Protein backbone atom coordinates (compact mmCIF):
# COMPACT_ATOMS: atom_id res chain seq x y z
CA UNK A 1 0.00 0.00 0.00
CA UNK A 2 2.79 2.44 0.88
CA UNK A 3 4.50 1.59 -2.38
CA UNK A 4 1.36 2.56 -4.30
CA UNK A 5 1.14 5.89 -2.46
CA UNK A 6 4.80 6.64 -3.24
CA UNK A 7 4.29 5.81 -6.93
CA UNK A 8 1.16 7.98 -7.14
CA UNK A 9 3.03 10.81 -5.44
CA UNK A 10 5.83 10.57 -8.00
CA UNK A 11 3.39 10.73 -10.90
CA UNK A 12 1.58 13.74 -9.45
CA UNK A 13 4.93 15.55 -9.17
CA UNK A 14 5.74 14.74 -12.79
CA UNK A 15 2.35 15.99 -13.94
CA UNK A 16 2.80 19.26 -12.07
CA UNK A 17 5.98 20.04 -14.00
CA UNK A 18 4.90 18.78 -17.43
CA UNK A 19 5.89 20.92 -20.38
CA UNK A 20 3.09 22.72 -22.16
CA UNK A 21 2.99 24.82 -25.30
CA UNK A 22 1.50 28.29 -24.99
CA UNK A 23 1.03 30.60 -27.97
CA UNK A 24 0.16 34.27 -28.01
CA UNK A 25 1.46 37.81 -27.68
CA UNK A 26 5.01 37.93 -26.28
CA UNK A 27 5.24 41.41 -24.81
CA UNK A 28 8.43 43.22 -23.73
CA UNK A 29 7.27 46.82 -23.13
CA UNK A 30 10.29 48.01 -21.12
CA UNK A 31 13.53 46.74 -19.55
CA UNK A 32 13.15 43.49 -17.56
CA UNK A 33 9.38 43.33 -18.15
CA UNK A 34 8.17 40.43 -20.26
CA UNK A 35 5.05 38.28 -20.33
CA UNK A 36 3.03 36.06 -22.64
CA UNK A 37 -0.67 36.69 -23.23
CA UNK A 38 -2.51 33.59 -24.44
CA UNK A 39 -6.09 32.30 -24.44
CA UNK A 40 -5.80 31.49 -20.72
CA UNK A 41 -4.55 34.91 -19.62
CA UNK A 42 -1.26 36.66 -18.93
CA UNK A 43 1.84 34.70 -17.86
CA UNK A 44 4.66 36.63 -16.17
CA UNK A 45 8.12 35.82 -17.47
CA UNK A 46 10.12 38.70 -16.03
CA UNK A 47 9.02 41.67 -13.92
CA UNK A 48 11.33 44.58 -13.18
CA UNK A 49 12.34 44.77 -9.53
CA UNK A 50 11.77 41.08 -8.82
CA UNK A 51 14.18 38.19 -8.98
CA UNK A 52 14.28 36.56 -12.40
CA UNK A 53 13.63 32.85 -11.98
CA UNK A 54 14.59 31.95 -15.56
CA UNK A 55 17.97 30.40 -16.31
CA UNK A 56 20.26 31.65 -19.10
CA UNK A 57 19.08 29.00 -21.58
CA UNK A 58 15.45 30.02 -21.03
CA UNK A 59 16.33 33.69 -21.55
CA UNK A 60 18.19 32.93 -24.79
CA UNK A 61 15.20 30.98 -26.11
CA UNK A 62 12.92 33.82 -25.08
CA UNK A 63 14.85 36.42 -27.05
CA UNK A 64 14.91 34.14 -30.11
CA UNK A 65 11.13 34.56 -30.17
CA UNK A 66 11.58 38.29 -30.89
CA UNK A 67 14.56 38.05 -33.29
CA UNK A 68 12.75 38.57 -36.60
CA UNK A 69 12.43 42.35 -36.88
CA UNK A 70 9.80 41.98 -39.63
CA UNK A 71 7.50 40.21 -37.15
CA UNK A 72 8.21 42.49 -34.16
CA UNK A 73 6.25 45.66 -33.34
CA UNK A 74 8.23 48.38 -31.57
CA UNK A 75 6.18 50.31 -29.04
CA UNK A 76 8.94 51.88 -26.92
CA UNK A 77 12.33 52.33 -28.61
CA UNK A 78 13.74 48.79 -28.86
CA UNK A 79 10.90 47.27 -26.83
CA UNK A 80 7.62 45.93 -28.13
CA UNK A 81 5.87 42.66 -28.89
CA UNK A 82 5.76 39.66 -31.19
CA UNK A 83 3.64 36.57 -31.69
CA UNK A 84 5.22 33.37 -30.39
CA UNK A 85 4.78 29.82 -29.18
CA UNK A 86 6.74 28.81 -26.11
CA UNK A 87 7.09 25.31 -24.71
CA UNK A 88 7.27 25.99 -20.99
CA UNK A 89 6.86 24.92 -17.40
CA UNK A 90 4.43 27.18 -15.53
CA UNK A 91 3.44 27.97 -11.98
CA UNK A 92 -0.32 28.17 -12.45
CA UNK A 93 -0.87 29.55 -8.97
CA UNK A 94 1.35 32.57 -9.71
CA UNK A 95 0.47 32.73 -13.44
CA UNK A 96 4.16 32.68 -14.26
CA UNK A 97 6.49 30.85 -16.60
CA UNK A 98 9.31 29.12 -14.72
CA UNK A 99 11.29 27.47 -17.55
CA UNK A 100 11.35 27.79 -21.33
CA UNK A 101 12.24 24.63 -23.28
CA UNK A 102 11.51 25.79 -26.85
CA UNK A 103 10.48 28.99 -28.56
CA UNK A 104 9.25 29.91 -32.00
CA UNK A 105 8.42 33.35 -33.30
CA UNK A 106 5.26 33.29 -35.40
CA UNK A 107 3.92 35.71 -37.99
CA UNK A 108 2.04 38.58 -36.31
CA UNK A 109 -0.89 37.65 -38.53
CA UNK A 110 -1.32 34.39 -36.64
CA UNK A 111 -2.02 36.18 -33.34
CA UNK A 112 -4.14 38.80 -35.08
CA UNK A 113 -6.35 36.05 -36.49
CA UNK A 114 -6.68 34.17 -33.19
CA UNK A 115 -10.00 35.47 -31.85
CA UNK A 116 -9.16 34.35 -28.31
CA UNK A 117 -6.28 36.89 -28.08
CA UNK A 118 -6.91 39.50 -30.79
CA UNK A 119 -8.55 41.83 -28.25
CA UNK A 120 -5.41 41.60 -26.07
CA UNK A 121 -3.01 43.03 -28.66
CA UNK A 122 -0.43 44.91 -26.57
CA UNK A 123 -0.66 48.32 -28.21
CA UNK A 124 -0.08 51.23 -25.81
CA UNK A 125 -2.79 53.42 -27.36
CA UNK A 126 -5.77 51.06 -27.43
Explain the meaning of each model-derived region.
Residues 18-71:
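N-terminal secretory signal peptides
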Amino acid sequence: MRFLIVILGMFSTLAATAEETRCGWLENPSPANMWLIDRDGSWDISVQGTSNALDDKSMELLYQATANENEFVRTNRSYGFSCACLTVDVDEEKSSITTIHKSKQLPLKQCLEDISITKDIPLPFK
